[in-house]
Amino acid sequence: MNPLRKKRLLIIAALLAGVGLAMTLALGALKENINLFYTPSQIANGEAPLDTRIRAGGMVEKGSLQRSADSLDVRFVVTDFNKSVTITYRGILPDLFREGQGIVALGKLNAQGVVVADEVLAKHDEKYMPPEVTKALRDSGQAAPGGSSTPAKQG
């Protein structure tokens, strides 16, 4: 093989190896940051993976909020009106968090079927509902409380 061709081949091989390594690192980083959304029905049916960060959303059941007297631990139940799932959270809940309203909790599902959340997001106003929660309620045949919901703008 000609030395010039050999040098070009080595350069091309090195570039391809570098691009492959960069793609592997980028996809690995993206995989760690992906949080798939699951409804309470999907979680109760075992579709959500254990010990993997997920987003769980639905309506907070009225009367389900339990606060610890001596810590910031909170426990509540979220429903899609078909099935329910318990969520635990340690921290201060958002000011807009209310029973009977939509939320999205980010956390991990444990072996007992409880979502241990490290972040809780509440809806912004009376008519706003997270798009995932709106879709989940529509799929379950339920309407959002208080009339129609306004989904977030896409784009």
Curated annotation (Swiss-Prot):
GO terms for biological process: cytochrome complex assembly. Residues 134-155 are annotated as: Disordered. This is Cytochrome c-type biogenesis protein CcmE. Gene3D superfamilies: Nucleic acid-binding proteins (2.40.50.140). Residues 30-155 are periplasmic. NCBIfam families: PRK13254.1-1, PRK13254.1-3, PRK13254.1-5. The keyword Ribosomal protein does not apply. Heme chaperone required for the biogenesis of c-type cytochromes. Transiently binds heme delivered by CcmC and transfers the heme to apo-cytochromes in a process facilitated by CcmF and CcmH. Keywords: Cell inner membrane, Cell membrane, Cytochrome c-type biogenesis, Heme, Iron, Membrane, Metal-binding, Signal-anchor, Transmembrane, Transmembrane helix. Belongs to the CcmE/CycJ family. HAMAP family: CcmE. Residues 1-8 are cytoplasmic. Its main location: membrane. GO terms for cellular component: plasma membrane. Heme binds at residues 124, 128. It is found in: Cell inner membrane. One of its GO terms (molecular function) is heme binding. The chain crosses the membrane at residues 9-29. The lineage of its organism: Bacteria, Pseudomonadati, Pseudomonadota, Gammaproteobacteria, Pseudomonadales. It comes from Pseudomonas savastanoi pv. phaseolicola (strain 1448A / Race 6) (Pseudomonas syringae pv. phaseolicola (strain 1448A / Race 6)).
